């Protein structure tokens, strides 16, 4: 055998071993998987599961607009194509009617379907793996109690090569490690509960942690914010940086936003408004506050997205000021001080001063309402201005707002507005 053949043989063997190792790592199950919990009271277990399903916002992905509850069909756009939320009602043919509690646990904890096939991580099992077996069994009991719906699942529509499901093994080997969240004995019960909800059932990292080019969350930059792929909304940092994060908020402020959709600092908009509407407003006061306590314990890490340094010309500031006076000052007040929670202050508003201006641009373009909640059933709304202001006007207006009354957030270009308009719900 020549030297070249020997080298090629060694390289080939190394590749086979590497691929085999990746496949093993990507398909392995958590060795700590335990037996199903025994329920003392079935009705109590179902009610607990109903609450957990709300806390985990299951409806958002498993109920299509205008469709039957939990029957699936919701399109979930990703940079790699579209996947559709499956039917998780107890229908035997199209849902999970034939699934056991162990099958359901395998999906939630190990990211595998009943037949052992690997699930796409649009289903956030990377976070749900932290959920306890007891909570998984409660969720299962609740899903078994809902009305079965016969609705076939729609297959994913992914680009090549992302449509090759076996490749998920390599992705999982790199980015997924199954394991239930262990309590930190050095922290309080309240802190541990908040951490469990944020990092596990609430899967906050799915939006609030930046992602790499393969769609995995960057574990080195947890909860430092990021633009939500395809939807083009910015999920701000949950860290305690004073300029870009939650540094100016209290735990009670965070709980108020989760429960009501509004706070002393800002109101929920875009995808977060939907989360409040369908999920967090239903949290108990204790759970909402526990989330706030945990978030306030996070370090003051700056936003992962670098703050823009677009200079704003004096002429643009002057024109932006005129547009603000004509269109905005009546509600938000001449100096951006706002008026209660109905018309939030723009001075110091984290939506305005965020590292990315996209949320502020989208609000001007589309307008919108804070979510209607039990504590705020008739939220005030903001009219859309995308039909009466052009891209240049909106760029100057948002630049003015981001750089007035103590705000120092950088300018906005007409090109950024054009891109946001393309993603606008009113386009």
Give the ranges of each region predicted by the language model.
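Flexible coil segments in periplasmic/lumen-exposed cytochrome c-class electron-transfer proteins
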Residues: 25-36, 64-83, 114-195, 199-200, ...
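Aromatic- and charge-enriched surface segment that lines or borders ligand/interaction sites
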Residues: 96-112, 116, 138, 247-251
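Short, cysteine/histidine-rich loop/knuckle motifs that typically chelate Zn2+
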Residues: 60, 206, 330
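N-terminal type II signal-anchor transmembrane helix
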Residues: 1-33
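Short extracytoplasmic
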Residues: 40-75
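Acidic/histidine-rich, surface-exposed loop or edge segments in extracytoplasmic proteins
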Residues: 82-90, 233-239
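C-terminal structural cap/anchor segments
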Residues: 319-362
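Glycine-rich, acidic and aromatic/proline-enriched surface loops and short helix-turn segments
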Residues: 110-113, 260-264, 366
């Amino acid at each position: 055998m020549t030297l070249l053949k020997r080298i090629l043989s060694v390289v080939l063997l190394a590749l086979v071993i590497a691929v085999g190792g990746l496949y093993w790592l990507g398909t392995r199950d958590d060795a700590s998987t335990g037996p199903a919990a025994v329920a003392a009271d079935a009705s109590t277990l179902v009610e607990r599961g109903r609450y957990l399903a709300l806390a985990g916002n299951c409806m958002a992905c498993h109920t299509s607009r205008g469709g039957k509850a939990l029957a699936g069909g919701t399109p979930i756009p990703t940079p790699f194509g579209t996947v559709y939320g499956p039917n998780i009602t107890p229908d035997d043919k199209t849902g999970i009617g034939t699934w056991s509690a162990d099958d359901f646990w395998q999906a939630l904890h190990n990211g595998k379907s009943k037949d052992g096939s690997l699930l796409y991580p649009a289903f956030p099992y990377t976070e749900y793996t932290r959920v306890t077996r007891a909570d998984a069994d409660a969720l299962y009991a609740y899903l078994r109690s809902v009305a079965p719906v016969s609705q076939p699942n729609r297959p994913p529509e992914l680009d090549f090569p992302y449509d090759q499901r076996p490749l998920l093994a390599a992705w999982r080997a790199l980015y997924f490690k199954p394991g239930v969240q262990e309590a930190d004995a050095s922290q309080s019960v309240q802190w541990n509960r908040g951490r469990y909800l944020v990092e596990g059932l609430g899967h906050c990292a799915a939006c609030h942690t930046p992602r790499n080019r393969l769609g995995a969350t960057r574990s080195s930059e947890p909860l430092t914010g990021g633009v939500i792929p395809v939807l083009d909304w910015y999920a701000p940092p949950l860290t305690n940086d004073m300029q870009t994060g939650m540094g100016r908020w209290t735990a009670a402020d965070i709980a108020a936003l989760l429960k009501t959709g509004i706070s002393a600092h800002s109101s929920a908009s875009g995808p977060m408004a939907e989360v409040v509407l369908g999920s967090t407003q239903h949290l108990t006061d204790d759970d909402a506050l526990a989330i706030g306590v945990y978030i306030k314990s996070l370090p003051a890490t700056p936003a992962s997205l670098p703050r823009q340094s677009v200079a704003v010309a004096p002429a643009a500031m002057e024109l932006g000021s005129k547009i603000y006076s004509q269109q905005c000052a009546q509600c938000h007040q001449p100096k951006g001080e706002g008026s209660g929670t109905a018309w939030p202050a723009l001075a110091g508003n984290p939506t305005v001063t965020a590292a990315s201006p996209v949320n502020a641009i989208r609000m001007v373009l589309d307008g919108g309402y804070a979510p209607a909640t039990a504590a705020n059933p008739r939220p005030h709304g903001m009219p859309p201005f995308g039909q009466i202001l052009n891209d240049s006007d909106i760029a100057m207006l948002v630049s003015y707002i981001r750089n007035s009354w103590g705000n120092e957030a950088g300018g906005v270009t007409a090109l950024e507005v054009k891109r946001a308009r393309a993603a606008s719900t009113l386009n």
